[in-house]
Each structure stands twice: as C-alpha cells, then as structure tokens.
Regions:
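N-terminal secretory signal peptides that target proteins for export/translocation
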Residues: 1-9
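Bacterial N-terminal signal peptides
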Residues: 15-25
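Intrinsically disordered, low-complexity proline-rich segments enriched in Ser/Thr
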Residues: 22, 57-58, 164
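Sec-dependent signal peptide cleavage junction
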Residues: 24-40
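Ser/Thr/Gly/Pro-rich low-complexity, disordered linker/stalk segments of secreted
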Residues: 35-82
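Short, surface-exposed linear motifs at loops/turns and structural transition points
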Residues: 76, 80-377
C-alpha cells in the first residue's frame, strides 16, 4: 500500500524514505542532521513510572563497580579533579512515556545549593546537566531524595550512563549504570508480572532499534523476536474533505521520540491551517507547517509534525486536519501502525524492510505491555 501520490523517484524518496531513515526525532535536506539524536530532560505527565530498583550490591556478570561505591574516573588534563560533593546514591527508577527516562535518586547535604547539578555523560559524548532546582523531590526508603532524570533513545539501553554531581564548580565521583541493568534487575527480582512484561518488551524493542540503526549491534539490549504478527490491516489511513488529493504522503520518526510527519500540497497564495487531535471531536492543537521547498502539480509541498506519541499510545489513530477559512480541505486519520501496515506489505517483497518491520513489531508488543501495566496501576 502506497502512502504517497504517484510521483518521480526523487519525490518518492522525500515522502517515503525521508523519515523512515528515522530521524533523530526532529525534522530532507537534513537527513544527516536528523540522525544525530538530541537528549533532553523534559518529562511528560503521561509517563508510566516503573518500580524502584536498589543499587546492586555486586554485579560480577557485568564487571561493573557497585554504584554505591563509585570509582573515580581516570584523570587527564581535560578531566576536572574529583571532589567529595556529599551525595549518596540511593537507587533508580524508570519512566516510560514519550521517552525512556531513568532517574538517579540521591540524598544531598542540606547545604547543597539549588544551582548544583547532576551531570550525565553518554558514550556519544552527549552531556546534559539537571539542576537540583529542576529535579524531582521524592521519598525513597524512608529518605528524602532528589531524583535526577536522564533520557536515552531506545537504541541506547545498553549505553553506560555516567552521572556525577557538580557543586560550586567541583565534580563529584562518577556513578555508572545502564537502562538494561535496571530492566534486568526487575526481571530477576520479585516485581509484578506486568512490570516484568514491560521490562522484557522494552529490552526487545531496544535490541531491534540497535539493529535498525546499526548501533552497537554486538551488545544488543534484547535478542528475542517480537510476538506481534503485524496484523495492522485495521490501521489503514482514512482521508476526507473537499481536497483529499492535496495529501502528499507521510513518514515516520522514531527517535528520540515517536512522531508522524505528514506532507500536504498547498496552492500558491492559499492560507491554510493545520491542527492535530487524538480523536475526532477532541480539542485540537495547531501545527506549524514547514515549507519543503518542493513543488508538485504546481503546488508547494509543506509538512507538519505531530506531537510526540507516548509508547502506550502508539496504537492511536490521531487526526490531522488541513483547513482554509474554516472549510475542511483534508482530514487525515493516520497512526503509527498505518505506516507499519505499509512496511509490512513492502517487507513481503523486499527483505531490506525487515529490520524496520521487526522494530515496529517490537513497538506493537511494547505498546500492549505499557497499556497492561498502566491498567494494573
């Protein structure tokens, strides 16, 4: 099933492949730019909090040091001297919403300033800081803790996250942990079955993301095959309105958040508005069109990008509307698995599509597990 108009090969590349090269979350001039993931620290209110994990007392199978007894990093001229900043690592938790977010829980001395921060460093040299003032204040193990969030892409579940406090210009000791460590902890200990199912499906999704993006494929988060049969026929997209032919195509963004990019043709001089709603009749959010500097059939091609889609809502069929002076030109009902249904059909005749198909199958399983976990409370 083709989700684009019949057009020349370069134009098909724009609509079909532009973002299936699955950008770094953001917006085809920019494929190279889109493949550099940006890590942010904003957490959605729709996140599902996954249970607490204590710092492991020993991890001989990974050879990792006990995070409660951090090991100072080797010093070189570019590395600041390690100081005693007074914090104590208490444990971890994970939130799964629009992103994968792991929290480092620490107790801090009472005189820790609000501009002190936890600094996170990933293997790709991404460095972020979260100030005490911006972190969550939580109770854990009967103690008042500060929970610092660190977001990672699905392909980064096996990446070492190095965390250290920065207080008054001084750098504390380094704590090293991975999201995979956390998920394995859940699977190996006494946690509800729904939490274990969610942990297992997230590991499989992370492994399929690594294979699709060609990222650290020698150390996969999960190696099992997804259970989903990719039966997505009910997700075929629907369009209505007076000018449905002005719908040009769609592409899918999977990193670092899930979004759908829709392309529309707009006549010269026309002032069109675009909106997004999770369902018809629900409150709408205005979308800002972006000029692709491409023309087709004498019209300009623009795209709009949906808001980030949480993992547990990946089976939704949101509505994007193109209007002019209040008239419905094109009302498009299209979800993640609308795109998945097209990939399934392509994979039947083109094996190169199988990594993407398997990634979407794993997402299907993860969505189901996240919904079950949410219902279980």
């Amino acid at each position: 099933m083709n989700h684009t108009k019949q057009k020349s090969w370069p134009q098909r590349l724009l609509a079909l492949l532009a973002a299936v090269v699955l950008c770094a979350a953001l917006p085809a001039a920019a494929l190279a730019e889109e493949n550099t993931a940006s890590i942010q620290t904003q957490v959605s209110e729709t996140d599902e909090d996954i249970p607490w994990a204590d710092p492991p007392q020993s991890t001989p199978e990974t050879g990792r040091p006990d995070p409660a007894v951090p090991t100072p990093p080797p010093q070189d001229p570019a590395t600041p001297e390690t100081a005693q900043t007074g914090e104590h690592l208490e444990g971890y938790s994970l939130s799964l919403g629009e992103t994968v977010t792991i929290y480092f829980y620490v107790t801090l001395p009472e005189d820790t300033p609000q501009d002190a921060a936890m600094q996170f460093t990933l293997p790709d040299s991404t460095v972020t800081q979260v100030a005490v003032a911006d972190a969550k204040q939580m109770e854990a193990n009967g103690k008042s803790c500060t929970a610092f969030p660190c977001q990672v892409a699905a392909k980064q579940l096996t990446d070492d996250i190095e965390a250290r406090m920065v207080v008054n210009g001084k750098y504390g000791p380094v704590y090293t942990y991975t999201v995979k460590d956390y998920l394995n902890y859940l699977l190996e200990h006494d946690y509800p079955q729904q939490a274990k199912e969610l942990a297992g499906t997230l590991l499989v999704y992370g492994g399929k993301a690594q294979l699709y993006f060609g990222y650290r494929t020698d150390a996969l988060a999960g190696t099992a095959e997804p259970n989903s049969t990719a039966n997505w026929g009910s997700y075929q997209f629907e369009s209505s309105g007076t000018q449905t032919d002005d719908y040009y195509g769609s592409s899918l963004l999977l990193e670092p958040v899930i979004q759908i990019r829709h392309y529309f043709m707009v006549p010269d001089g026309a002032e069109c508005t675009f909106t997004f709603a999770w369902n018809a009749g629900e409150p709408e959010t205005e979308l800002q069109p972006v000029d692709t500097n491409t023309r087709f059939n004498g019209k300009k091609v623009y795209y709009v990008v949906t808001p980030a889609i949480a993992f547990r809502r990946a089976d939704a069929m949101p509505v994007v509307a193109m209007r002019q002076n209040g008239a419905d030109l094109c009302i498009l009902r299209y979800g993640v698995f609308s795109y998945g249904d097209m990939v399934r059909a392509l994979a039947a005749v083109d094996e190169s599509q199988l990594p993407l198909l398997n990634l979407l199958r794993a997402l299907d399983d993860l969505t189901t597990a996240a919904q079950r976990y949410s219902v279980a409370g």
